[in-house]
Amino acid sequence: MADNWYVGNAAADGKENRGWLLGHFLEGSNGVRASDAVEVKWGTHPAGDGRDSWQTDEQRTTILLLVKGRFRLDLSAGTFVLEHEGDYAVWGPGMDHSWHAEEDSVVITVRWPSLPV
């Protein structure tokens, strides 16, 4: 495979990295998918799945886009429910968050820059 292009399947490729497709955490052997600039995740969450504890001290900007399902996002600024295909939320550095899949859900998460935690 060439270093500057890649074609794949998000569900299949994400199985190795908890859904993450791009980011600093992918080894250089992953070519163009190894990035310090951006992280991309294909998240498949069954109803009831969630992160109850808050993700704190976040230093990246994030967009979470609902592909299907119903997904609750709890931010330090309030609670928001993404329920229509294409609904999304964007938050910047310093915003704490947790989440809960209210129905079987698929979401795309993009964070930048890609930073070690």
Give a label for each model feature:
Residues 77-94:
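Short acidic-glycine-tyrosine-enriched beta hairpin
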Residues 1-47, 51-54:
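A short, N-terminal "cap"/entry segment at the start of jelly-roll beta-barrel domains
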Residues 56-72:
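Short, conserved beta-strand element in jelly-roll/cupin
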Residues 43, 88-90, 103-117:
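A short hydrophobic beta-strand segment most commonly corresponding to one strand
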Residues 32-34, 51-58, 75, 81, ...:
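Short histidine-centered beta-strand/loop micro-motifs
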Residues 67, 75-77, 101, 109-111:
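Residue-level recognition of conserved beta-strand positions in structured domain cores
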